[in-house]
């Protein structure tokens, strides 16, 4: 068995583990110490529960703002597989960003954390509204209608999680004010 050098700092070893190595260590601890399950789950819940709609909204808005018209031009036009319409490709790029956030919302649904799912839904919708109202980039001109068009899609995804009626009503009342 390999041992840590007595002069080494154990914290340094732990802090320098890659994500994959950390995951392997956690799985091994979990298997070898079933009594740690509760502590590990509580800690994981604290980590994944650190979510709020405003932060999600701002992150989505910033991610959408970072979409680059030069990348759009590089991904569209004549190419090896034929012509790619820049209008269509701009929507594809927009949807790729939004889909990441919807995927996060669905991940929390799989974890059975409905309060976080609701925060994600609210955050995504607010981020789309903010982008629609405030974005003034060359790229945003290509997707003028996309933000508001995607709100219905976000709500459809949220409805698939079977939220409580009061939560859905709250989201719908916010959207109806548009």
Regions found by a protein language model. Give the residues of each.
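Eukaryote-biased, non-catalytic alpha-solenoid scaffold regions
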Residues: 1-12, 24, 31, 35-178
């Amino acid at each position: 068995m390999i041992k840590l050098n007595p002069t080494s700092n154990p914290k340094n070893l732990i802090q320098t583990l890659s994500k994959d190595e950390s995951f392997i260590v956690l799985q091994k601890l979990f298997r070898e110490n079933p009594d740690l399950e509760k502590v590990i789950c509580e800690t994981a819940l604290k980590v994944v529960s650190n979510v709020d709609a405003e932060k999600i909204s701002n992150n989505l808005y910033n991610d959408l703002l970072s979409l680059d018209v030069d990348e759009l031009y590089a991904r569209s036009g004549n190419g090896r597989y034929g012509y790619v319409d820049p209008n269509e490709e701009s929507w594809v790029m927009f949807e790729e960003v939004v889909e990441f956030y919807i995927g996060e919302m669905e991940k929390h649904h799989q974890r059975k954390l409905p309060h976080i799912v609701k925060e994600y839904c609210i955050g995504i919708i607010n981020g789309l509204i903010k982008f629609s109202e405030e974005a003034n980039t060359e790229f945003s001109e290509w997707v003028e209608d996309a933000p508001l068009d995607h709100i219905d899609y976000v709500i459809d995804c949220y409805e698939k999680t079977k939220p409580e009626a009061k939560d859905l009503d709250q989201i719908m009342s916010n959207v109806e004010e548009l």
